Amino acid sequence: MANHKSCEKRARQTVVKTERNRFYKTRIKNVTKSVLSAVELADKEKAVEAMKAANQYFHHCVSKGILKKGTASRKVSRLQLKVNAI
């Protein structure tokens, strides 16, 4: 239990930020899975559409500070390679 006012505030902020980060991280996993499932089905049109949405979301997460720029670029690049292989 926090003893100082500032510690209590930091504890509250941590709860809010943890919840927000969990939302973004879950959505990242979901958009990644949607691309991979389209690739698995060899559905080029669906994969390209899902990849476009994933690319936008990864870069949105970078602007929010959820992911680092290099991490997002690496993930997008690896997904794009799989989409291009169809």
UniProtKB/Swiss-Prot annotation:
Similarity comment text for this entry: Belongs to the bacterial ribosomal protein bS20 family.
Annotated InterPro entries: Ribosomal_bS20 (IPR002583), Ribosomal_bS20_sf (IPR036510)
GO biological process: translation
GO cellular component, one term: small ribosomal subunit
Job description of the protein: Binds directly to 16S ribosomal RNA.
Coiled coil: none
Gene3D superfamilies: Ribosomal protein S20 (1.20.58.110)
Provenance organism: Aliarcobacter butzleri (strain RM4018) (Arcobacter butzleri)
Protein name: Small ribosomal subunit protein bS20
HAMAP family, alphabetized: Ribosomal_bS20 (MF_00500)
The keyword Cell inner membrane belongs to this UniProt entry's keyword annotation: no
Keywords, comma-separated and alphabetical: Ribonucleoprotein, Ribosomal protein, RNA-binding, rRNA-binding
One term of GO molecular function: small ribosomal subunit rRNA binding
